[in-house]
Amino acid sequence: MSNVKKIKGFADLFSPESDVFTFMENTARDVFSSYGYGELRTPILERTELFCRSIGTETDVVQKEMYTFPDRKNRSLTMRPEATAGVMRAYIEGSLHSQEQVSKLFTFGPMFRYERPQKGRMRQFHQINCECLGPQEPYADAEIILMLLMFLKRIGLSGLELQINSLGCRECRPQYHAALRAFLASLDTAELCEDCRRRMETNPLRVLDCKVPRCKELTADAPVILDHTCDACSEHHSVVLGMLERAGVVYTANPRLVRGLDYYNRTTFEVVCGEIGAQSSVAGGGRYDGLVSQLGGPDVPGIGFACGMERLALALEQKAQREVPRPDFLVAVLEQDGLERGMMLAEALRESGLKGEVSFAARSMKSQMRQAGKRNVRKVLLLGGSEIADGTVTVKDMDTGGQTTISLDAAPGAVAD
């Protein structure tokens, strides 16, 4: 019988890779809570209709990438391809709009898209999401971007590029659509990819999001959306940029930045890291003022972002800026009658706030020192025959090679030093 194997595009996360994910989540909790955000956990499974109505039926996500299936009552369900739609559903269903004027929420968890697996892009991937619902003022846009940048700085990333654009609103965007359609009609459309030819009719803005090199080349001179935004949208964008400049943030204006989901309006942004290759976007988001009402809720504006955790981990690996935490100790028991004492010593060390392991069987010094080196521990506490007889322990510093024999009571202080 053949071995059971994981599904293509899905990964097992072992330590230390999983430790990096935990580090990012804990850092995110610390940063986001300082801005007044609270954690929300939403289901992985949602009704397919939710994503069709929010993301847009003409997007690649809905057309090609969703894991969708009928349940036993023939209801169409989908494994979430992104988090915002589920947060909006929870916001509406939980009547959060009636409880507070501004709701600030963050989520962690796996998302699912049927794409070609490659470095930084898996079929199951993990995201950190933030959503701010209620304020329509541009200061909310600036704050959430500043919060994102603070989070990225706290996890050890620097030298990233913030790209920003405005997509206008439902009043002024039709004018841009008309100008864009006229431009696209002037091209030799036979040279565009099949998806772009379809998008020309259904949602021309999606053409600007195409990654096919020839399509990007043909649309290089497409009309710029900021030349077609209304006065209100232009003022909104100007205030956002002004706030970022006053905060000392360097950004790049990217008129082609439309994002891959239909619900965005006005501010859109991405953070890119060129060092991780083709999948260079590590975070992105924007404003979605009509999304809540589109899903049957009140007319509540909102803005949010998502970070791809696999891509963040890749960026951290490339920049090598994060030091992986080392275990404080390994209690190495060399004699069988020292196992109970070793267990109690390890518990005392953990009670004092230290982290480490204890051997469950008496093994040779060579074997346990090899384990200590593999674990990259700071100190090894040796319990051999003489230590067991004397009620002492020998502490070996793995960095300097020095060692000293002390009483068991003094062990926590010696390991902490």
Swiss-Prot record:
Catalytic activity: tRNA(His) + L-histidine + ATP = L-histidyl-tRNA(His) + AMP + diphosphate + H(+)
Listed GO CC annotations: cytoplasm
CDD domains: HisRS-like_core, HisRS_anticodon
GO molecular function terms noted in the UniProt entry: ATP binding; histidine-tRNA ligase activity
UniProt key word Transcription: no
Gene Ontology biological-process entries: histidyl-tRNA aminoacylation
EC code: 6.1.1.21
Protein name: Histidine--tRNA ligase
Record keywords: Aminoacyl-tRNA synthetase, ATP-binding, Cytoplasm, Ligase, Nucleotide-binding, Protein biosynthesis
Record's subcellular location: Cytoplasm
Classification via PROSITE patterns: AA_TRNA_LIGASE_II (PS50862)
Database matches in PANTHER family: HISTIDINE--TRNA LIGASE, MITOCHONDRIAL-RELATED, HISTIDYL-TRNA SYNTHETASE
Enzyme kind, highest EC tier: ligase
Annotated SUPFAM superfamilies: Class II aaRS ABD-related, Class II aaRS and biotin synthetases
Gene3D superfamilies found in the cross-reference section: Anticodon-binding domain, Bira Bifunctional Protein, Domain 2
Taxonomic superkingdom: Bacteria
Summary of subunit composition and partner proteins: Homodimer.
Protein species of origin: Oleidesulfovibrio alaskensis (strain ATCC BAA-1058 / DSM 17464 / G20)
Statement: the UniProt record of this protein carries the keyword Protein biosynthesis: yes
Signal peptide (UniProt feature, chain positions): none
Pfam families in the cross-refs: HGTP_anticodon, tRNA-synt_His
